[in-house]
Amino acid sequence: NGFGRIGRNFLRCLETRQNSLLEVIAINDSGGVKQASHLLKYDSTLGKFDADVKIVDDGHISVNGKSIRVVSSRDPTKLPWGEMEIDLVIEGTGVFIDTPGASKHIEAGAKKVLITAPAKGSDIPTYVVGVNAHDYKHSDAIISNASCTTNCLAPFVKVLDEKFGIVKGTMTNTHSYTGDQRLLDASHRDLRRARAAALNIVPTTTGAAKAVALVLPKLKGKLNGIALRVPTPNVSVVDLVVQVEKKTFAEEINNAFKEAAAGSLNGVLAVSDEPLVSVDFRCTDVSSTIDSSLTMVMGADMVKVVAWYDNEWG
């Protein structure tokens, strides 16, 4: 539901997976088949999609020969989810992120809803792959996958806390601009996001650090942070500074990350020893890539960790 940055990237990503159990059979987007097919095929950030994308008729597109129905309704209760026997709705509009909103998909006949953003309200459980996904209950009809930044932050925070014990900390998130900002100065509920995205570093709020407590409850009240939106279209970076209980040094911390990346967090966490920049992490599948050269320790108990992530893909 919604075929914007997240919806289109989800479909692109799915097409690269072999033997996936998922099949996209419907898209709800106000743009219709012409917009859906064109924006899926041509992408300013990712380049041309290496797939055969065609308009079949006024209500269908095809991707590599597989037909996908395209509908356009702003009211989820009017969507044909029951008729189409939809198992899972990927809720990617950023609008229906609370129980009353997301439940409209269930009312329309879908079995489950995955919200691709932080949920509003404590009644919707949040799961982050590699952190607490094992707690998932099949009885949950509506779940949240948290934000891109929480998916970056939580895996390596989990390692830090398990190995060294986090006392408290703050995060600065240097984040690429998003569609929620203005291209040129214009009205916005956030006066800073009202300013031209491609011309400014824009300080703004982020709930990502606090949201870590939703998947790692013992860290409730221990983390906070801010975001700086910068003039890049994709890939972001987290700079976390924490006080830890156990005395340590940079190499020991990096080794803990490497051990986790090779073991329990394989495919979720990675460690880079190379001097890379943001564009090098575009379309990186993992949730978080530690930049080992930037790990610092002051006084044996103040730790700085920097991690990259593709905020549209990881």
UniProtKB/Swiss-Prot annotation:
Q: Which reaction does it catalyse?
A: D-glyceraldehyde 3-phosphate + phosphate + NADP(+) = (2R)-3-phospho-glyceroyl phosphate + NADPH + H(+)
Keyword set includes NADP:
yes
Q: In which pathway does it act?
A: Carbohydrate biosynthesis; Calvin cycle
- Locate the residues binding D-glyceraldehyde 3-phosphate: 147-149, 178, 193, 206-207, 229
Q: Induction: what does the entry report?
A: Repressed by addition of D-galactose, D-mannose, D-glucose, D-ribose or sucrose, but not by the addition of non-metabolizable sugar analogs.
Principal location: plastid
Q: Which UniProt keywords apply?
A: Calvin cycle, Chloroplast, Disulfide bond, NADP, Oxidoreductase, Plastid
Please list the residues that bind NADP(+). Answer: 5-6, 29, 74, 311
Provide the active-site residues from the annotation: 148 (nucleophile)
Question: What Enzyme Commission number does this protein have?
Answer: 1.2.1.13
Q: Which domain of life is it from?
A: Eukaryota
Which cellular component terms (GO) are annotated to the entry? chloroplast
Annotated NCBIfam families: GAPDH-I
Q: Which family does it belong to?
A: Belongs to the glyceraldehyde-3-phosphate dehydrogenase family.
Record's miscellaneous remark: GAPDHB, the second subunit found in plants, is absent in algae.
Identification of the protein by name? Glyceraldehyde-3-phosphate dehydrogenase A, chloroplastic
| Taxonomic lineage of the native organism | Eukaryota, Viridiplantae, Chlorophyta, core chlorophytes, Chlorophyceae
